[in-house]
Amino acid sequence: FSTIATGGLSPLNRSIAHYNSAYFDWVITFFMFISGINFVLHYRFLLGNLGIHGRDEECRVYSGIVLFSIVTTAVALRYGAFQVVSVITSTGFFTADYEQWPAYTHFLFILLMFLGGSTGSTAGGLKALRVLALARLVRAETVSSLHPRGVFPVRVRGRIATSEARA
């Protein structure tokens, strides 16, 4: 259970790096990743709704951010994936000394800490749904400034965000 986001508890000084096992890294990365996804989606999946994760906007945004970040770390896939998922879910495990990585990865990790996982998960951060809503609001306000008489609703999960929610 310590792989659940915000856990990060390890009795070892070198955390998960102590084991130096690709198998451990991938299993822990998987469980950290799913702990950053809305638990309601997992529940619906267990009830037989097998495609629920792929249909959920927030899950797709969260997964996209994670995949993009893994690719842009430009280090070994095993270490990059582990660190990215650990950072975005605020789990706190580590398997590599990312202080030795390129400087842009430090900025990326700070951004990932700020963004966080999905709503309804144990991950910290702003949450992927709020980031999605903010991006859509910025787009709608930009288009609205170009077309002041137009009406550009912001939709999140198929629903129009109210003006109170947009404020």
Where are these regions (language model features)?
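Membrane-proximal intracellular helices of multi-pass ion channels
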Residues: 1-167
